C-alpha cells in the first residue's frame, strides 16, 4: 500500500504497525519463536540462543515471583548491560512488575533519590556497588538486595575465570555488613537457571502494565523524577525502527552483531541497544563500561558488525587516530543523541579506510518522551541534515508561538506527531504537559525544542537547539550553532560555547579542546585561535560570534558521554579568574 513514507523506505517497512497490545514479554517470546537458532546475546565468552533466552526469562520470572515480587512492584537494576539486567526486564514485565534502570556508577545521593522516587523494594547490584551503597540503603524504600557478579555471567556456565575482563574487580569484596531491615541474597542462589522452559513457559503473565521500564530523569538529587515507558510504546518504537536495525541483514542475509556503547539505563540505550535489536532477531553484544577507555576493549573483544552510540561516545573513537585498526570489523555506526560534525565523520571514515573498510555512519534523532522520530542515512551530504521521519511518524516545522507551519526553507521548531504519544496519557493529560499541543488538524503534536527547517525534498535540517537559547541585543543566539562552526576548524577536537555574565552583559566564550600538538607550540595555538575567529566571522551573525576562545586539555562529560555544559561554564569562569586581564585563556596541561 502506498504511503507518505514509501518515498524514503522500502514498501515492506513503510507501513509499520503503530498500535499493539503486546507486552515486552510477548514481543520477546514472538522473536524467540521466530528465530530459535539465532544468537540473541553475547556476553564475554557466552552465547545465548533465542530459544535459550526465552527459557531463561521464564525461569527468572518464576524466581522473582518466588522472592515475593508482585504486580506493581519496582526493582532497581544498577549493574548495566549484562544478562542479569536483560533477563530481569522481560521477566519482571511478565509478572506485572517494573524495572528501574540506572547508571552503574550513580552517586549515592542520586541512588537514594531515585530509589525513593520510584518506590523500589528490590535492587540488583554488584559487590562493589554494595560497598558504595550499603551505608545509605536504610534511607531508601529498598528492602531486599540481590548481589550479582559480572564475571559469572561473562563466562557463562563454564567455570573458567576471565581475569582480563575489565569489571572482574567489581565482583569483590564480598558483602560483610548487612544493614538492619535489609535482606541480602545472591543471584546464583536465588535465580538457579537450568534452561528448562517446560516448567515455566506456560505460566500466566500480566498484560496490563503501564510502566514497564523506568529511567532516572535528569534533575536535582533531592527531587528525582522518573521517565516511565509502557511496553506498548517500546514495541511501536521497535516497529518503526526495524528497517534501520535490519539494514545489514537485508544486504547480507545474516543477522548483524551489534554493540551498543550506551548503557541500558537510558531510553536510547535500552530501546535501540537491546529491545529493538532483539525484537527483529539481531545479536546483542552486551558490555558494561565505567569510562571511555573500556569502549575500545569491547570493540576489540567482540569485533562487532555495527556500533550504536551517542555522538560523544562514538566520536571518542576519533581520538585513537587513523593509525588504529579499531574499526576493522565495523560496517556501520548508528549515532543517536546528536549529529556528528563533518570533521568527526571524516575522521571515522579515515580510520575505517586505514583498516580496509567502507564505513556507513547514519543517525537517529529522538528524545526520551518520544523515543526516536527521524533517520539520517549515511549518504546525506550536509551534516545539518537529520534526514526524514521514521515510518509512521509525522514531522513538521512550526512557528513555536502559533504552532502553524512556516514557509518552506524558513526556520521554526521541529514538531512531531506519533501514535506512541497516546500511550503516555489522554489528550487532556498530554496537552497539560508543556511540550504537547493540540493543533488545528486535531492531532497532538510534540514540540521538540530544536530549531530546524525543511527543503523542497521534504528533508529536515537541524539549525540549533533551543536549550540555552539567549538574546544578545535583539538577536536570538544558539550556543550549539557556535559549537558547530568552531568544530569545522582544522585542529579542533571538541568545542562547547557557554554564556557568561560580564559588566557589558551576556557574552559567549567557546571552550575548545585542540589537537595535542597545539599545547607544545604557542604560535600554533595562537594561529588556531585566529582561524577559529575567522571561521566564526565567515559562518555566524555578529551577535553569535564568541568574544573569546578558551583552550582546555579536555572538557567534562556527563554519564552519557555528553559534554556537561554547567561544568564547562564553571571551568571557563575559573580560568578567567586565574588569568590576568588581556591574556589569552589557555589551560596549562598537566605535567607528565
For every predicted segment, state its role.
Residues 470, 496-499, 509-511, 533-592:
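Conserved C-terminal "lid"/linker of ANL adenylate-forming enzymes
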Residues 159-164, 175-182, 305-308, 320-382, ...:
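Gly/Ser/Thr-rich phosphate-binding loop
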Residues 1-48, 52-67, 71, 152-180, ...:
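N-lobe entry segment of adenylate-forming
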Residues 106, 114, 125-129, 307, ...:
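AMP-binding/adenylate-forming catalytic core of the ANL superfamily
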Residues 67-69, 194-211, 215-260, 282:
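Conserved adenylate-forming
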Residues 388-392, 404-438, 475-477:
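Conserved ATP/PPi-binding loop(s) of AMP-dependent carboxylate-activating enzymes
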Residues 235-257, 265-306:
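Conserved AMP-binding/adenylation subdomain of ANL enzymes
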Residues 43-48, 61-106, 255, 259-264, ...:
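Conserved AMP-binding/adenylate-forming
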Amino acid at each position: 500500500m502506498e504511503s507518505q513514507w514509501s518515498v524514503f523506505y522500502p514498501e515492506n517497512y513503510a507501513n509499520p504497525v503503530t498500535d499493539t497490545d503486546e507486552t515486552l514479554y510477548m514481543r520477546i517470546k514472538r522473536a524467540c519463536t521466530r528465530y530459535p537458532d539465532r544468537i540473541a546475546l553475547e556476553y564475554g565468552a557466552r552465547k545465548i540462543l533465542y530459544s535459550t533466552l526465552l527459557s531463561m526469562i521464564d525461569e527468572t520470572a518464576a524466581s522473582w515471583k518466588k522472592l515475593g515480587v508482585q504486580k506493581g512492584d519496582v526493582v532497581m537494576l544498577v549493574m548495566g548491560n549484562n544478562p542479569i539486567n536483560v533477563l530481569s526486564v522481560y521477566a519482571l514485565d511478565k509478572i506485572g512488575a517494573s524495572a528501574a534502570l540506572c547508571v552503574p556508577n550513580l552517586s549515592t545521593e542520586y541512588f537514594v533519590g531515585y530509589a525513593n522516587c520510584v518506590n523500589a523494594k528490590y535492587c540488583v547490584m554488584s559487590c562493589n556497588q554494595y560497598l558504595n551503597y550499603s551505608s545509605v540503603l536504610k534511607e531508601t524504600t529498598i528492602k531486599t538486595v540481590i548481589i550479582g557478579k559480572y564475571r559469572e555471567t561473562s563466562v557463562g556456565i563454564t567455570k573458567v575465570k576471565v581475569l582480563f575482563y575489565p569489571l572482574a574487580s567489581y565482583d569483590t569484596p564480598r558483602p560483610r555488613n548487612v544493614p538492619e531491615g535489609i535482606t541480602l541474597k545472591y543471584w546464583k542462589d536465588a535465580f538457579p537457571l537450568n534452561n528448562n522452559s517446560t516448567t515455566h513457559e506456560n505460566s500466566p503473565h500480566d498484560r496490563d502494565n503501564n510502566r514497564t521500564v523506568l529511567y532516572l530523569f535528569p534533575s536535582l538529587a533531592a527531587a528525582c523524577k522518573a521517565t516511565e515507558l509502557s511496553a506498548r510504546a517500546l514495541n511501536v518504537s521497535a516497529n518503526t525502527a526495524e528497517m534501520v536495525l535490519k539494514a545489514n541483514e537485508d544486504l547480507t542475509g545474516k543477522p548483524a552483531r551489534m554493540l551498543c556503547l550506551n548503557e541500558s539505563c537510558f531510553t536510547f540505550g535500552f530501546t535501540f541497544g537491546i529491545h529493538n535489536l532483539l525484537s527483529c532477531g539481531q545479536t546483542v553484544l552486551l558490555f558494561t563500561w565505567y569510562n571511555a577507555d573500556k569502549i575500545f576493549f569491547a570493540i576489540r573483544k567482540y569485533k562487532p558488525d555495527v556500533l550504536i552510540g551517542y555522538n560523544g561516545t562514538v566520536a571518542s573513537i576519533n581520538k585513537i587516530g587513523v593509525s588504529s585498526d579499531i574499526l576493522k570489523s565495523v560496517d556501520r555506526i548508528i549515532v543517536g543523541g546528536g549529529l556528528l560534525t563533518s570533521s568527526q565523520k571524516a575522521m571515522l571514515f579515515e580510520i575505517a579506510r586505514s583498516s580496509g573498510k567502507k564505513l556507513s555512519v547514519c543517525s537517529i534523532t529522538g528524545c526520551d518522551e518520544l523515543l526516536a522520530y527521524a533517520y539520517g542515512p549515511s549518504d546525506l551530504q550536509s551534516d545539518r541534515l537529520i534526514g526524514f521521519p521514521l515510518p509512521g511518524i509525522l514531522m513538521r516545522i512550526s512557528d513555536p508561538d502559533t504552532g502553524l507551519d512556516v514557509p518552506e526553507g524558513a526556520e521554526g521548531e521541529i514538531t512531531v506527531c506519533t501514535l506512541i504519544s497516546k500511550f503516555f496519557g489522554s489528550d487532556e493529560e498530554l496537552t497539560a504537559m508543556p511540550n504537547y499541543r493540540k493543533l488545528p488538524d486535531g492531532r497532538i503534536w510534540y514540540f521538540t525544542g530544536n530549531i530546524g527547517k525543511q527543503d523542497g525534498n521534504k528533508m529536515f535540517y537541524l539549525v540549533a537547539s533551543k536549550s540555552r537559547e539567549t538574546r544578545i541585543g535583539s538577536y536570538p543566539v544558539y550556543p550549539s550553532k557556535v559549537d558547530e562552526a568552531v568544530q569545522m576548524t582544522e585542529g579542533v577536537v571538541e568545542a562547547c560555547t557557554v554564556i557568561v555574565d560580564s559588566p557589558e552583559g551576556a557574552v559567549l566564550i567557546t571552550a575548545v579542546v585542540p589537537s595535542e600538538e597545539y599545547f607544545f607550540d604557542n604560535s600554533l595555538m595562537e594561529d588556531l585561535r585566529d582561524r577559529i575567529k575567522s571561521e566564526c566571522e565567515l559562518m555566524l551573525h555578529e551577535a553569535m560570534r564568541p568574544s573569546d576562545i578558551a583552550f582546555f586539555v579536555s572538557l567534562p562529560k556527563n554519564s552519557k558521554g555528553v559534554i556537561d555544559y554547567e561544568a564547562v561554564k564553571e571551568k571557563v569562569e575559573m580560568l578567567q579568574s586565574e588569568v590576568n586581564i588581556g591574556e589569552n585563556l589557555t589551560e596549562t596541561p598537566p605535567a607528565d
